[in-house]
Amino acid sequence: MSYSFTEKKRIRKSFAKRASVLPIPFLLATQIESYAAFLQANLEPDQRAPEGLQAAFLSIFPIESHSRNARLDFVNYVLGAPPFDVKECQQRGLTYASPLRAKVRLTIMDKEASKPTVREVKEQEVYMGEIPLMTNTGSFVINGTERVIVSQLHRSPGVFFEHDRGKTHSSGKLLFSARIIPYRGSWLDFEFDPKDYLYFRVDRRRKMPITVLLKAIGYTPEQILENFFSFDSFHISRKSILFELLPERLRGDTARFDILSKSGKVIVQKDKRITVKHVREMQQAGIDRLEVPEDFLLGRVLGHNVVDKETGEILALANDEITETLLGKLRDANVEEIRTIYTNDLDQGAYISQTLKIDETADEMAAQVAIYRMMRPGEPPTEEAVKALFIGLFYAPERYDLSVVGRMKFNRRVGKTELDGPTTLSNEDIIAVIRILVELRNGRGEIDDIDHLGNRRVRSVGELAENQFRSGLVRVERAVKERLSQAESENLMPHDLINAKPVSAAVREFFGSSQLSQFMDQTNPLSEITHKRRVSALGPGGLTRERAGFEVRDVHPTHYGRVCPIETPEGPNIGLINSLALYAQTNEYGFMETPYRKVTDGLVTDEIHFLSAIEEGQYVIAQANAELDGDGRFTNDIVSCRHKNEFTLATPDRIEYMDVAPAQIVSVAASLIPFLEHDDANRALMGSNMQRQAVPCLRAEKPLVGTGIERVVAVDSGTAVKAVRGGVVDYVDASRIVVRVHDIETRAGEVGVDIYNLTKYTRSNQNTNINQRPLVKVGDVIARGDVVADGASTDKGELALGQNMLVAFMPWTGYNFEDSILISERIVANDRFTSIHIEELSVVSRDTKLGTEEITGDISNLSEAQLGRLDASGIVHIGAEVEAGDVLVGKVTPKGETQLTPEEKLLRAIFGEKASDVKDTSLRVPSGISGTVIDVQVFTREGIERDKRAQQIIDDELKRYKKDLADQMRIVEADAFVRIERLLIGKIATGGPKKLAKGATLTKEYLESIDPHHWFDIRLADEGASVQLEQIEEGLAQKRKAFDAAFEEKKKKLTQGDELPPGVQKMVKVYVAVKRRLQPGDKMAGRHGNKGVISKIVPVEDMPYMADGTPVDVVLNPLGVPSRMNVGQILETHLGWAAKGLGQKIGDMLRAGKEIVELRAFLDKIYNTSGKPEDIASLTDGEIADLAQNLQDGVPFATPVFDGATEQEIKDMLELAGLPRSGQVTLHDGRTGEAFDRPVTVGYMHVLKLHHLVDDKMHARSTGPYSLVTQQPLGGKAQFGGQRFGEMEVWALEAYGSAYTLQEMLTVKSDDVNGRTKVYESIVKGDHKIDAGMPESFNVLVKEIRSLAMDIDLERH
């Protein structure tokens, strides 16, 4: 087993019993692959598949003019290079996007020619707007902020059958219905009403009898009956009526007359029910015709039109009921045979026939007109309009599209074998659906479960973007059609025809403000990755919160391995927003799949199959925890399995598949909770959600007890920096790592250098701090994929959301009542939970009517201390410590001219005083923020002179870029010179620098004596070597040229003006870093849904301590465990203590200077006594020493979900660490020194500080803004508002009879405008009298009554 560079520095001991068959797939694959398929950017235009952008273009083009004389064809499209990279876009507030150009061909036909001939063809590239690009971490940068497009779970197109569960009609009768849902186009519903008539409706409009639709699509009543019924035949003569008998149709009926055999024996007596036995006897007796009485025929329904053979007159129509009169008429016309439809009350209802009776339309045209009137009420139905509308509804590909998925689902449901076909509806499709619906009503078949994941599919980014792009193109198509007719006469080019604005508007609208385009949750790496793996049932075309019932939100058996049953928000969105399970992926149709191991003849193989929910139902699937022997055979005779969405037991020979891993059913966040199997699901849900709110601490600390997935999450989220290629570290500082790549990994023409510029103190979307730290030293050899730098909340390449705290479960004088948390002062002193938050404050200088606002350091009425922080340009220095109210950027705005008195004019003229014309509108630090300025950015509009500060920022950036290029060049040259040295030594020269003699052999000493750049001047006798030398020289010259061009490009980008909103001349952004220490009121939590608020920070000496004097860090309430049933936290605490104890033992061994052999033996005991074995022997002595050094503060454990450490293993580890097997110890009270009565559970728990900090919530108003109409103070921290004194609070004061307090509350402290000012004046004068007046809200009430035309006045006494 090989370990990566960072893994071998700290190996996590895993308790997993089952070896992993399938590595966890790349966690952002869904997003990245979906968008790559949409763009197809790295494919040649002619190799692109018809999906994504290509499909959108092909579905709209070619566009023909109305006269068919001009046509616009699509050839291909090209995506240009984005003008700015991701970082530049974030700084400048731009969208990271690529220009899209489509090549189109305009063909104009010759009108005059007799047969169609082409007059001219023009081809041209047309700009189609910008398409946002995805960053390599699966997000988008839109207007400078990172956003995520969440995948949507929607109802799959196809056909669905359901019933109303007896809720519509009072009798509780089940009313069946069917619905054909296309990908785009009109919905078609079929439904039964309580009287068993069958109706249809289009797009939920008013219903019409189903036979109207069948007639409209071209069926006659005769054909309709033929399609849905089987017939009984009768032979009529003057004397008798013979009935062609099919005995099985009579079963269950009552005989209306004696049924006799040919010999005259009675088989069934009159009024007896015909049973299966009777039917068998009739078949044996060979009865095929029966003479029946007349009333047996009466009341039956004709299945065809009856025509008089002689006259051609229609005697009776299909679906007519046979009466005595009609029967006489038929006998008179000598009709010999008639067919009636076969129905019975049990399983052959006459629904279609009855519906045909209530249908008043006569023929196809009348039916189509009826449908037209329903769709377009009030419009006159002309024949063309009626035909066009009807064809457009279900038959025109541009208006109606079932999609490939819809056709596949449709064919599967109606029982066809082939899964592809046209994506519009056909007559056969409609007949097939009605047939199944009638069968359902007849009691045969099953309805569909719409919450089954086989009936819901995922639309990912690519598909959502494609739909938006297509909708933009449809708008373009309309405009192009209009203009094409002009193109014929006016000699227009393709770019004159196409206006790309609708396309770019649609795309911008989607990425900027769609419900599914969300501001990325960037609190920590886990919240990023979870946001990108989220699946939402909301959004356009999805559900709404209000309408979604319980069933949709509930966990469904098909969620197994596809959607996490645990992670979902609490509140109104519960169950509507889900998270993809760890191994889940989507198939080509958009249905979720999960992997299983193939089982053949009871032997579990390593062959992996991905199954969708539809396929899974038909197999017998064993759980991941089924016991296997060494060969991979099931050891038990009966194994717990899943089959047809039910849990059952099966013998090994029946099993066809087996789960891949125990963690397969949960999502990333849930799989990070150790001992998840011991937690109640509700608490696990809170735990998953709270991990996403953990604020990155100053120093990340790996969890002592993890689940082994931490490394995968840290690397896949993109926060930890991964080596792109293997090599040797050449240079490291805090902000960049330079790697000299191995020769074998460098392709021809590539630069053999990788430079990793690290992100330093950058603000995330949630104002947390993103900071990367290098993990490598100069000279380290790294391989591709190794972690070279840690990001926020990662520790040596592992996710580290919180800190490991020594916790004790015990009460402490009521300070941990109701989930409060008591913490030690030591935590605060050691900055364990200190976090850095970065606030972005910006100011713009605009061009106003009265003149331009000016950013300047020259501001009147500012103290020296305030001005001292600003530079000459009026912008704060980096590194300045600022408090609330301090000036960050000085800015003055021109004031309107006021009328001056002659005296003032005179003074002005003498002193030239102009300063009073401006008012101070500087950017100040808002209340509640104090910190250090860490960065300043200045943006200037094109054509406006830059100030010194802006210039200096640009120069620094260029210097940094130059350094990168110089490093690359240095390494490239060094590599080249090594190659040249190898080439030259030992070769014969014909001349060269330092008067090199002809025929001399080149030596290392000679080469070292001259500047390597002069080696190119050496002339060689060997022709081949000379050519090689020239090639290397040329290669270096090209590289230099490329680097110079790159530098110039960067310089041009930086020196060109910035794009700013209209009217804005300059924008300054100041970044302030705020340090937040832990304090009472902050919310903290464990990973098991155990959350609480800090109630008190206690001095270290008062905390409970162990016998050796170690004080605990956190005291938690033991009552928080039993009722919440999250026992996982207790097991984590025990195992965490063992981890720490083992680390201390290793530390003692190191300090005692023990031999490496002893260390190896002890490590072997830890790693290889139980759980997954680790290959300690493969590490060198140096690596073992390094590993032991890193394990001193605790041996990290992994206890994977559903496959974790057992109670026995935890006890063994405690014993190995020399700790009590019970995990409990007697503590002493820090205040008195006395021992507590009972042993207390003590250990290490990974505790998180959540992003609900008291600093962000605390706020106090003295005087602030008032609401305009009511003149009452505003509410909320953002508005600097007051506390609401509501109705109930008024009752409280009334109850106490405190009249004056009440009066003060409702008047001068609220909306008595005059009273407020008077109170202020009297307080200033030292007089504490209150004179309350009229509250403004009363005036508002008076005004409202007047608005109702009632004159109301106040009478003053």
From Swiss-Prot:
Belongs to the RNA polymerase beta chain family. GO terms for cellular component: DNA-directed RNA polymerase complex. The gene is rpoB. InterPro entries: DNA-dir_RNA_pol_bsu_ext_1_sf, DNA-dir_RNA_pol_bsu_external_1, DNA-dir_RNA_pol_su2, DNA-dir_RNAP_su2_dom, DNA-dir_RNAP_su2_hyb_sf, RNA_pol_bsu_bac, RNA_pol_bsu_CS, RNA_pol_bsu_protrusion. Keywords: DNA-directed RNA polymerase, Nucleotidyltransferase, Transcription, Transferase. NCBIfam families: PRK00405.1, rpoB. The RNAP catalytic core consists of 2 alpha, 1 beta, 1 beta' and 1 omega subunit. When a sigma factor is associated with the core the holoenzyme is formed, which can initiate transcription. The keyword Nucleotidyltransferase applies. One of its GO terms (molecular function) is DNA-directed RNA polymerase activity. This is DNA-directed RNA polymerase subunit beta. GO terms for biological process: DNA-templated transcription. DNA-dependent RNA polymerase catalyzes the transcription of DNA into RNA using the four ribonucleoside triphosphates as substrates. Pfam families: RNA_pol_Rpb2_1 (PF04563), RNA_pol_Rpb2_2 (PF04561), RNA_pol_Rpb2_3 (PF04565), RNA_pol_Rpb2_45 (PF10385), RNA_pol_Rpb2_6 (PF00562), RNA_pol_Rpb2_7 (PF04560). It comes from Nitrosospira multiformis (strain ATCC 25196 / NCIMB 11849 / C 71). Its EC number is 2.7.7.6. The keyword Transferase applies. It catalyses: RNA(n) + a ribonucleoside 5'-triphosphate = RNA(n+1) + diphosphate. CDD domains: RNA_pol_B_RPB2. It comes from the Bacteria.
